[in-house]
Amino acid sequence: MTIFFGNYLTQWGKSTVAKLIAGYWDVTSGSITLGGHELKDMPLSEIADQISYVSQDNYLFNRSIRENIRMGRPSATDAEVEQAAKQSGCDAFIRKLNNGYDTVVGSAGSHLSGGERQRIAIARAMLKDAPIIILDEATSSVDPENEDELQRAIEALTHDKTIIMIAHQLKTVRNADQILVLDNAHIIQRGTHAELIRQNGLYADFVSARQEAIGWKLAQ
């Protein structure tokens, strides 16, 4: 798992990197390769088959929850749809709805909360089962309890997939195989959590500041 990390208070280019990797935009210089092939030379359909992209702001169609999740893989059975929902931590809240998986979510998912919409989008990505998953602040609207559940599900996927995560929360990045620290749209540090702490750079400064902030809050 590789995580692009930056302070959420500033525009450091994390989401731009995610969209470039996903093939949403073309690079103006340099190159992005997938399996040794230039991304810009690959058919969009092939890129779409290889990559699942989950952003902070995911669109749901005015259809049932089941149909929205199944868009990840139209041939999926009901059991597979529900398994993906369990993995993403949304099965419990879905079953509490009057119509369960057949609940219509409303225009752009307006009948659901932001966190619920996000978990359904993650379930859709899990069902798609693409070899590359990009999570662009994908847990930002999820409450702490469900975020922990999502994190466990994401970790379970890493044994046979490439996970690229955009994040600014420390608990999200600590266990990553590689953390890339961005500042003003440039990668300035690279390594594991422990390696970056030893470097005493921007990442270590941020960790220290967060720990001090938590200590201050607890002392109030």
Predicted features along the sequence, with ranges:
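P-loop (Walker A) phosphate-binding loop of NTP-binding proteins
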Residues: 9
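ATP-binding Walker
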Residues: 12-13
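Conserved ABC transporter NBD signature motif
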Residues: 30-37, 47
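A short, conserved alpha-helical patch in the ABC ATPase nucleotide-binding domain
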Residues: 69, 73-74
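C-terminal boundary and immediately downstream tail of ABC-type ATPase nucleotide-binding domains
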Residues: 198-220
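Conserved coupling/switch loops of ABC nucleotide-binding domains, chiefly the family-specific signature
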Residues: 28-31, 184
